[in-house]
Amino acid sequence: GILGLEASVASLVAPGETVLCLANGLYGEGFADFVETHGGEPVVYSVDEAEPFDPDEVGSLVEEHDPVAATMVHCETPTGLLNDLDEVLGVLGDAGVLTVVDAVSSLGGTPVPTDRIDVCLGASQKCFSSPPGLSTLTVSERAWEKVEATPQDSFYTSLEPWRGVDLDTDEAVLLPYTHLSSNCYALEASLDLLLEEGLERVYER
């Protein structure tokens, strides 16, 4: 999952650009480190690990700092805190701020509004019950446009090589680099089991 988290920042954030990092736990704070590593300017909105984010405060910070993107974690692994995304995503969306959400610990275990998130990050472990080693991402068209407009200083941590890769085909697909194929088969099997049980039943348990 960490590769996906860093790749989202590396691909979307140009040096000097401001990113609002919402943090009420370890992984929320970690986003700020990635922003700094890639030359961005993090503005950290930090609250206690048991507290939710205040949408009004998020709006004020957006108005004050004009960030190109905002990062947050859906479920903080160490505490199990599940953040309510709806209001915060609404505020950020209305302001035109790109949203990056770490859903590594929640995707597959509880509903995640991926259609409202510009980059939603998951991983093969956690709720997918598959071996670790694969990052999963959904990327909006708006986010792809920002990737293409942002100078990419890395290949491995850039999303750009994945632009246009179509996995929904029976034809041979050339991927940007070699994957651990055994993990891909394992993830496919895990997803089949989740779908066979039914997502609503999975969410209930």
Segments from the language model and where they lie:
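Conserved beta-loop-alpha segment that forms the PLP phosphate-binding cup at the N-terminus of a helix
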Residues: 1-20, 24, 28-32
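Predominant activation on well-ordered alpha-helical scaffold segments within soluble catalytic domains
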Residues: 6, 10, 32, 59, ...
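Gly/Ser-rich phosphate-binding catalytic loop and adjacent alpha/beta segment
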Residues: 21-64, 74-82
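Conserved active-site segment immediately N-terminal to the catalytic lysine
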Residues: 114-125
